[in-house]
Amino acid sequence: MADTGGRPEVSLATVRSPGHPAASTTAAAAADLGHADTGQEKPTVESAQPANGAAPMGECGTEYRGLPDGDAGGPMPSSARTVSMIPLIFLIFYEVSGGPFGIEDSVGAAGPLLAIIGFLVLPVIWSIPEALITAELGAMFPENGGYVVWVASALGPYWGFQQGWMKWLSGVIDNALYPVLFLDYLKSGVPALGGGAPRAFAVVGLTAVLTLLNYRGLTVVGWVAICLGVFSLLPFFVMGLIALPKLRPARWLVIDLHNVDWNLYLNTLFWNLNYWDSISTLAGEVKNPGKTLPKALFYAVIFVVVAYLYPLLAGTGAVPLDRGQWTDGYFADIAKLLGGAWLMWWVQSAAALSNMGMFVAEMSSDSYQLLGMAERGMLPSFFAARSRYGTPLAGILFSASGVLLLSMMSFQEIVAAENFLYCFGMLLEFVAFILHRVRRPDAARPYRVPLGTAGCVAMLVPPTALIAVVLALSTLKVAVVSLGAVAMGLVLQPALRFVEKKRWLRFSVNPDLPEIGVIRPPAAPDEPLVP
């Protein structure tokens, strides 16, 4: 155990709960996601003072202490949490999907059959395991640090910071997509938005308006997400009904394995079916997260898959195939072919509003992640400051700045770069998930994936293989840029420790957070920069 060097010791709480039955398949685990275990006995809390001083976050099996009222342990009382079930489902929907806008490249890259198979198989291989991990660890650590705290408590604060850096950067890159998609859908009706100064001004204006919406608070964002979600999906429901008489099932079976752009195909599928863990950085704002978060994830998985397959089947089955036309924005053209100009304008309007929903949901996740990291002492304290609406102002401004810097990249470049960074972060999450199971098998888990440790390892084999494939298929340019970004994070954490030691910026730990390690004063001058 590391020497504390005169730091104040804190008592840690070991929470034990009854065991949960294990299942044998991922499908059974996914079904269980729909109902969090609410029949547990109240966990008993025993004080356990380490013999040689308290350990830093992530060492010696320190555990997260739950609230005594049965709510999943969190830094905020239930009365201060504002996000309920329905808004949470739509926030997850927009974190992950937002509708079928952007899935067109999967058909252009691989044809109808592989696109349909991809959106049926990848949710089982990737989305369900990621949602299950998020349900268990998000309920176990219901604070705004989310996956940063999962990794920090398992691997230590250095790797927790790396997780936060890669995931935040990936999220900001992801958010830079939405102005691009928004303008791609509008440029057929407003050609001036296709490039040049009008496009640049449109990106800046849109980013400013949506950033202001985030500033007004999660309650506003959540209910706006519901309204946008309903409006954005309605035209596809209508398009599917119009397409019924024109469907030719044989068109769904078209495949040409000799003409597949595997890199574009996998990156498009992966981008449209990941980011289930992003909602964890809002867990500190969710009402009764131990019950609400797993249920919301269950419903959101079904919601997302149906929202992709329904228009994909309608578009590929009712319109003769021209793979060259299947690029982002093509659903508006399909709507015009099937229903006329009125349906095309409706789809374009829905795309615009959907991108607004995805933007505000992603920015909420990114900005609250920075707040959560600051509350754990990983970032300067000004990131933890909240506006009068309870929102993280510094995190919002930093995230918006990143979006503006990256929004001039092309759609495909953005997708490939964010997927590369996201993969590294997911590998750390997988390791943290297994380590928590091995080191803390009896820790309180309001929701527990109904698999034993061996079953959890088996569940993670397919997604790990998928990550390897996505990384292997990345272009040299994307790999160099992404690895450069990773290297920046490796240097940035020691640099921040140096700044802390010099007292150039203030760092602090929120005392209201449950204890998962040492609450320490600023770094001592003789402390190593990297733990």
Swiss-Prot record:
Biased composition (Basic and acidic residues): 34-44
Expression sites by tissue: Expressed in seedling roots, leaves, stems, flowers and siliques.
Cysteine disulfide partners in this protein: none
Keywords: Cell membrane, Membrane, Symport, Transmembrane, Transmembrane helix, Transport
Main function: Cell membrane polyamine/proton symporter involved in the polyamine uptake in cells. Possesses high affinity for spermidine and lower affinity for spermine and putrescine. Transports paraquat, a polyamine analog, and thus confers sensitivity to this chemical which is used as a herbicide.
Family named by the database record: Belongs to the amino acid-polyamine-organocation (APC) superfamily. Polyamine:cation symporter (PHS) (TC 2.A.3.12) family.
Name of protein: Polyamine transporter PUT1
